């Protein structure tokens, strides 16, 4: 069975192995054992309540319980930019006009921005390529919304997600070559690694503070502004079906889009509800425990021992019927409450 739970120290080796499969461009999961160990400790301290909001970050793992192996990760940063500045580019417009010359021209422009300071961020989503099936990807991504819904008081009024921008098969970023390289004089992979390991001072020191005219960039750089890496297209689609949208902000390194939404308007947060657990073995006549039913995300309401699974079921009342195996995976007993939401919006066909 596949289940999502909070990260533990024993997961370090598996996460380090996963980090080696990400490739260039995923700044939040570098293959650096010391950094990953510190990331795990920060998550544990977040759950223990010993950090300020600007330092808090939750890290979840997807575990294959049969193999006893972590095969995916996803995370939530509680409030970005409160300790280290949070940078991106806002794609805006400057107008140049002259009545005397009868000239009026609007020019697309990149403005360095800290507009998302204080927002909660969905980040560090990565699934082992061998497990990109059976709806594991949407499960690992959307389970964070159930956690946010259950513990809404810990999160901002807005949620954002920086999507990995376009790089070619050699890890080359056209956007970086046309923008970042001129100011940093280092390779994209190096800047990507430094940022991912928390060494971000160079961004503030070297990034241009004045607007950049998009028309001055190379054509291939202009073409990838707001575009995602091909491997990130499914992750973007998952978030967009939940209500997150691109509002004209892009990553300063690779030009990838930032998606955002009001937290309470996210479909899985808004539509999630509680059910009371009933435990019974599967019966062919049982309409509720049905392998052909709609797919649902189901999670317990235990903050420190959060668990979530995917299950097929039909909802007929305020109760949720679980098999003993599902109840054990969730860590719940009969009479406990669980939070549930359909994996996909009712109008979305999967």
Swiss-Prot record:
Class in the EC hierarchy, top level: transferase
Enzyme Commission code: 2.3.1.109
UniProt keyword list: Acyltransferase, Arginine metabolism, Transferase
Catalytic machinery residues: 229
Protein origin, superkingdom: Bacteria
Amino-acid positions noted as binding succinyl-CoA in the UniProt annotation, renumbered to this chain: 125
Stored HAMAP family: AstA
Functional description taken from the UniProt entry: Catalyzes the transfer of succinyl-CoA to arginine to produce N(2)-succinylarginine.
This protein's name: Arginine N-succinyltransferase
Species per Swiss-Prot/TrEMBL record: Yersinia pseudotuberculosis serotype O:3 (strain YPIII)
Gene: astA
């Amino acid at each position: 069975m596949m289940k999502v739970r909070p990260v533990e120290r024993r997961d370090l080796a598996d996460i380090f192995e996963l980090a080696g499969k990400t490739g260039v461009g995923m700044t939040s999961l570098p293959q650096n054992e010391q950094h990953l160990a510190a990331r795990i400790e920060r998550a544990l301290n977040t759950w223990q309540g010993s950090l300020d909001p600007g330092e808090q970050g939750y890290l979840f793992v997807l575990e294959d319980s049969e193999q006893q192996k972590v095969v995916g990760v996803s995370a939530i940063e509680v409030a970005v930019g409160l300790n280290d500045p949070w940078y991106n580019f806002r794609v805006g417009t400057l107008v140049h006009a002259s009545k005397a010359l009868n000239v009026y021209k609007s020019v697309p422009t990149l403005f360095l921005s800290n507009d998302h300071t204080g927002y909660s961020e969905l980040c560090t989503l990565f699934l082992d390529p061998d497990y990109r099936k059976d709806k594991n990807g949407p499960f690992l991504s959307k389970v964070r919304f159930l956690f946010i819904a259950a513990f809404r008081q810990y999160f901002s009024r807005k949620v954002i997600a920086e999507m990995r921008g376009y790089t070619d098969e050699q890890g080359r970023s056209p956007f970086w070559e046309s923008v970042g390289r001129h100011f940093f004089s280092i390779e994209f992979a190096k800047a990507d690694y430094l940022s991912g390991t928390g060494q971000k001072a160079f961004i503030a020191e070297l990034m241009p503070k004045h607007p950049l005219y998009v028309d001055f960039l190379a054509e291939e750089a202009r073409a990838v502004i707001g575009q995602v890496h091909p491997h990130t297209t499914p992750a973007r689609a998952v978030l967009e079906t939940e209500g997150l949208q691109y509002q004209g902000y892009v990553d300063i390194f690779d030009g990838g889009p930032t998606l955002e939404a009001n937290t309470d308007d996210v479909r899985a947060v808004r539509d999630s509800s509680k059910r009371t657990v009933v435990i019974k073995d599967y019966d062919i006549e049982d309409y509720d425990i049905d392998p052909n039913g709609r797919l649902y995300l189901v999670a317990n309401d235990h903050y420190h021992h959060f668990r979530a699974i995917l299950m097929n079921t039909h909802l007929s009342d305020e109760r949720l019927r679980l098999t003993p195996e599902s109840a054990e995976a969730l860590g719940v007993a009969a009479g406990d409450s669980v939070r549930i939401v359909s994996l996909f919006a009712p109008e979305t066909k999967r």
